[in-house]
């Protein structure tokens, strides 16, 4: 986890064949990132384009000084100016909120519990659970705890990730003022044909603004992203609040 945290920008950008661009290469994208970064009072990150028709975007990097924002060719084709600004605001918010660090800490915590659970599981099998009758009850309890604890840790890790997505959505609206535009962008990305979904790797799916690996029902407990419908609903409420506060001010 520490290795992936330190070298995440290089690893993920290479994984998706992202190409760093300059303002001359793609003025629209570069200037949008520049504008939002200035509004957030952050250093300018690397700006990259992923050669994929699947509409998606992500931010990576261990801190604001070593960050990168990448968007796919497909995203640039289907979003208008305001929607693009809303999406970039979401990614800049992840950088501002230090979500790579928080995600690394959560993953490390879950990994440590998984290791301890494995040790306890083998201890229960070869120790208490396999010993005398009066030890079997305690050994069985230890075995159950060893199985449940890592599962609970992963669920908590995913819940933290979902909350960070909500926070990044809200921060994007605060930075850019584009609550409605981000909501319509999420709707467009969600409705993209299945054939256009980005070939996501599970290890990096949590970085994307739209996770095509998310599940439904009980499997949603293991999803890194909240349901799109709930994200849009929250953005619409925040937009209404911003209007009311504007009138009240």
Residue ranges and their predicted role:
Residues 1-140, 152-249:
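Polar-ligand-bearing catalytic/cofactor-coordination segments
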Residues 142, 146-147:
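Hydrophobic alpha-helical transmembrane segments of integral membrane proteins
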């Amino acid at each position: 986890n520490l290795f992936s945290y330190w070298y995440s920008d290089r690893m993920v950008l290479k994984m998706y064949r992202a190409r760093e661009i300059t303002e001359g290469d793609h003025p629209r994208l570069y200037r949008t990132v520049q504008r939002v970064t200035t509004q957030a009072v952050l250093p300018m990150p690397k700006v990259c384009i992923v050669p994929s028709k699947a509409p998606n975007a992500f931010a990576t990097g261990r801190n604001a000084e070593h960050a990168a924002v990448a968007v796919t060719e497909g995203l640039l084709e289907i979003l208008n100016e305001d929607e693009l600004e809303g999406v970039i605001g979401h990614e800049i918010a992840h950088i501002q909120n230090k979500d790579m660090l928080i995600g690394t800490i959560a993953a490390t915590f879950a990994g440590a519990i998984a290791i301890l659970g494995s040790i306890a599981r083998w201890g229960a099998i070869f120790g208490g659970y396999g010993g005398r009758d009066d030890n079997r009850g305690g050994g069985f309890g230890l075995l159950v705890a060893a199985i449940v604890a890592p599962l609970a840790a992963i669920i908590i890790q995913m819940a933290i990730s979902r909350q960070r997505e909500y926070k990044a959505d809200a921060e994007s609206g605060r930075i850019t003022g584009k609550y409605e535009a981000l909501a319509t962008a999420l709707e467009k990305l969600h409705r993209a044909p299945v054939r256009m979904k980005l070939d996501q790797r599970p290890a990096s799916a949590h970085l994307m603004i739209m996770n095509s690996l998310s599940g439904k029902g009980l499997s949603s407990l293991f999803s890194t992203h909240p349901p799109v419908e709930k994200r849009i609903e929250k953005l619409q409420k925040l937009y209404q609040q911003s209007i009311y506060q504007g009138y009240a001010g």
